[in-house]
Amino acid sequence: MNMFPLRLLVRNAFEGSLMAVFVLCLLHVSASAQETTQEIVQRGAHHRVVDVVQSGTPENPAGNSFRYTELATGMHYWDGTEWKASDPDYDVNGPLAVAHRTAHKVTLKANLAEEDSVQVVTPDGQEFRARPLFLAYRDGTNVALVAELKDCVGEWIGPGVVLYNAAFDGINAAIRYSVTQFGFEQDVVLYDQQGLNPADYLMNPESATLECWSEVTQAPQSQQTAQPLANQETDVLINFGTMEIRQGAAFTSTGDGPQVPVFKRYGQVAGKTFLVESVKSREFWQLLETLPEFSEPNPEEARVRKKRFFSTDQALLASLSPRARKATTAATFRRGTFDRKRAVVIDYQLVQSNPNNWVFTAGETFLVSGPTTFSGVTRFEGGSIIKFSKNVSASLSISGPVVWDAAPYRPVIMTARDDNSVGQPISTGTLSGNYSTDCLNLTGSGQPALLIQHLRVSHAQTAVRGQYWGASNPLTIRHAQIVNCGAGFRGEFGTYRVQNVLMSGLGVAFSAYYYATIQTAHLTVNSTPLFHQTTYNPSVSTFVVDNSLLNGSSTSGLTYTGAGTTYTYPGSTTMFATLGGGGHYLPKTSGLRNSGTATIDTQLKADLQRMTTEPPSVLAGEVLLDTELAPSVQRDTDALDPGAHYVPIDWLVSTLNVTGSTLGLKDGVVIAFTNAAGIWLKAGSALKSEGLPHRMNVITRYTAVQESPAAGAVGGGTVATAIYTGNTGVSLATAPAVDCRFTAFHPGYGSYHLFTSDGVGGASFYLTKAVKLRDCHFYGGLLSLGANTASATVELNNNLVYRGGIVCGGLMNFSMRNHLNWRASISVTAPAGSAWGFHDNVFDGCSPVTQTGAALIHNYNGYVNGSLRLTPSAANDRVIASFSYASVSGGLEPWYHTDATYATGLLDRGSQTWAAAGLAHHTVKTGQVPERSDASSGSSTLVDMGFHLVAVSTSTGLPVDTDGDGFFDVMEDRNGDAATTPSSGESDFNVSESGLGGSAPLLVFTPLK
């Protein structure tokens, strides 16, 4: 039954625009009219925290301030007293070149042939000593010496770069050593083909490998992780604690042609330790063929042509000339220049691995300004914004465990430094070209299968890259948007699943794939001329393309399988509909609907049935009569539409004004806003929002869903408000009221869920008569709560506050019960003579927690994971040092207690009964036992501390329906006391209203298409 008739009166557009200007003047900060100062307030080995202060403007006299974190591996080094910015260059002093202004220290000898000519000290003080020895070809058990290192003198040719010309006998080659703030690199630089044809050594070019041997005389203890590859090949990741050697590459100096993988092995031969890099001749030769056959006659060529062959590595090592074992020729470094003629390079890098754990925190903006690596546990929280500087090296590489915590309306967004549409405005806002190299580079060696979902990448050279994800531990990219990048996805040596991904405005969708199994479903590829491009043989990889839309993206040269895919070439200009910042909806009358015929992954299908290809409805003007909004766009519950699906938006608004009427939201409706305020409650208005336990109403910023900035929308740095109550001239009688249940708020981090605090604009400017928030989720942002009269009430019951915070002050009555305040800030200013109550809540890692004004009435609260506490300490509080939560298959959210016990957990520790708390049909347990049925301890009538989820059926995954009449218990027994006699407006959850008894519920979903 509708709460109100669906009627909407629209005032003229001029008045609406005045309202928008008012909100912008109040909240929006115009960066162009401000002076900006930056201060570094914290430094670490790989990061710095920057505070930004923007001066005031006539519209915002107070100005603006914010903070961001800049990341780059090796950004600083510790000089014994403080962190200093790294300066990766060599100080050249006679026989030595020393780089000591980085966390790792490098020393090179002028004559590379001397023993221990290359020395590296890792950030943790471990020493690595080595020198290159020779190149050899191998085919099966046969090995042939190609060239030995000879006396050669180093030249400083530029900041951080030393070159040893004429480094080998018999071939025209050099060795280059580069020091950077994040690592150290050796390049073997080949100038022509002389002496490098495997056929000259009686070896099969299809099976031979070229090897570069280096002797390691001292090294930290290593940990080697095998990386199984295609065709029974294996590479290893070699970790030395704070530094590691990853897979190298062979490539042309001009950047054209493929990057050929360089494999490694590391260990002892004949009692000595060697690092051996190898490259397959069949791929490597296509690089060498781009070089001239000969550059200049080599006086030692005749010796090389003698072709020495060996059947064991020991025999080969024994044959080396004494000069290569130990050289004593005196030499000094000199300055030189690098001849930038075409060459082929074989490289390896010893890089800092940053084993520390890291969190990309929801609500924060990060700037990746150089190569950034993590090998500890890296956590990505939905709502984090990761920006990249525009240079050739800004990248994010992960080789350790990944915890990916993103969800619908909480994507992880990776974009350019100059993109001010999201996150804090840390640059000019003038976008040009592509920024990061590999925006997200994921290595799967030794890791379990990984699901990356709800991700958006913009303005990268390559958006996502993966390597070493096998059939047993595949990498899945799901529900992602990749826009305005050079390349979308690059996969090597592994199994990759790319599902429900939008790729638009790219140069190529899939690039440089190599020995990859790529299984795609529900792709939309648009404004992208090439579906694939690789300089390797495409036949060594396989493609499956199911239920996808390839619009004007050439698949020439690619053989793929799959079903339900529409390929249009040249591209259609009418295939998609655009609304707001979403440019890839299907028109409602599209003939493509329901044409996705392929059988797809079960979980992917379940997700898509909750998503849509239909653009939202647009709501403009002002609500003047009681109005109810329900879902308006079609969820894909019947035969699947092909192509990428969006997380649904039902109604797109700039700012929705509500005056003298009640706005109702129901049944999981989603409202997205583009302005600085979402819903503006004016005099005489009310908001009544009630979703469903398993399908909550949502109020969100449009950027949480749509891939591009919308015309006229405010930027990411604007402080926005989902529900705004700023009004002049209101009294308690005409003040707005807010009543929300089963409603999720996503206004953007640093913004407001609800702004009702008194202060700005007069004593009653933000006055509200009543705020009731129950069973709601607040992600990021602030709940700013206040009223300047004791007749007003604010009641918070059983809500989740995820990061962000709560600020409350004023004269109203206030209570908070059964909250989970997770990593949130709490600020409370209670009026004199008040009885503000805080009971049965869990404060998890909250900081800061500040309180001023009158004393609070608080007891029976849980403080876990180091959370700060309300003061003074209360006798019945629970303080638990380590507490965690769980998700469960078929459950609602990942907030069930892993320790649901009385002895050590939060079970039955509350201040009142579950009936008084209204949580009879809720639970904190993974087993879905509702409070009313839980007899696990002697005090089982007492409510469990903290946030509860509605108990669901373990067979259907839907909220429990005891009497099987199709109405959930929690909706029939609205006050949640499980009383035998229902209260007014309730029905008995034990007795079927339909007369069906207690049989399993028959749930009828009317297809919306």
Where are the language model's segments positioned?
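Signal peptide processing junction and immediate N-terminal pro/mature segment
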Residues: 29-33
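Residues that cap or anchor secondary-structure elements
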Residues: 34-323, 330
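Beta-strand/loop edge motif enriched in small/polar residues
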Residues: 271-812, 822-893, 899-960, 970
